[in-house]
Amino acid sequence: MTDTARRYVALHPGDPAPWFVQRTTSSPRFGFDLAAGRYVVLCFFGSAADPAAQAALGAIARSRAEFDDERACFFGITLDPADESSGRLRDTLPGIRFFCDFDASIARLYGAAPSDVRPGEKQVPLRRFWLVLDPGLRVMRAFAFAGAGGGHNAVLDYLRALPPPDLVQGFAVPPPVLFLPNVFEAEFCRDLIAAYEADGGTESGFMVEADGKTLMQLDPRQKRRRDFSLQDPQLVSGVQARIERRIAPELRKVHQFTPTRIERCIVSCYAAADGGHFSAHRDNRSKGTAHRQFAVSINLNDDFDGGGLGFPEYGGQTFKMPVGCAAVFSCSLLHRVTPVTRGRRYAFLPFLYDDAAARLRLSNNRFLGDDVPVYQDPILEDAS
């Protein structure tokens, strides 16, 4: 079967680049969606043993300074297991990584390998090319390998000519976030902080997907925070009433969305003494969190430095909301909390979702690991 008879995915400028999870030479599980927030250069070269691939990788090596994980990063995609076993390819951080795509799953997604590749098929016809993605992981331009130079210099010249990532549209674009002042009164914020202080909270983890299960993971390199779950019925009902009265109407107006459920009533603390922070992440990327629709972040105090809320897909700006002000945003947005450098940042951090998402959450109980509490919904369970 010839190359032209095979079916290949075709990506064009403006198309969203497919997300995937794959191993790199230094990471057993790398979620590509977390690369957003900078220009991304992808190179589908097949095997580093190939002279054309060597020329491409040589061009990257000569331009090492371009890839700092701030303005830009590079991902090479190899289909050759010998590239890893021989040590020909190694991640060099910051900025340069290699995906071990030995099952051609990435190559199929991006059109480097035919989408109809059969398991165990030998001599897969490979299309070698470069892709440059914008900070939102949309395709900007593709470059084919061509001749001895392989078009490699053209890719790098194009990258160097791009504006700063914050100005890729020609102007700064604010993140799609609702900022709602006075959701919590100052006195109510103090009551929530007092409830946290009386308990002290526990170390907070985050959800990961492994072997089809959603698991809780603790990793202070990714997240350092302590959480306290509210137990006082008066405080819980006070939170619920204020969200229903002051956040839900704005969600209906702006997003035509009506929340009917709140996940977790927690007061959280990012402390400078602990190196409090949360690296870039999305809140709904596992089966156990897929129901989450909107995240809410309400600052309960302002006597701290650092701890800004940022959205890397929309630039490097971070936000420090006034006391009682809510930031409300889609759980699909990449976001982070910068390190707190002085004092403590206290925040109330629930997730909102609707009836359909509640049914999804209930059905996904079977995907929860043993360390994740099973979801119960009396309303849905009674209805069934």
Which residues does each predicted region cover?
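Chalcogenol-based redox active-site neighborhoods
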Residues: 2-165
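Short coil/loop residues immediately preceding or within conserved phosphate-binding loops
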Residues: 17, 127-128, 262, 295, ...
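Fe(II)/2-oxoglutarate oxygenase catalytic core
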Residues: 135, 153-326, 335-384
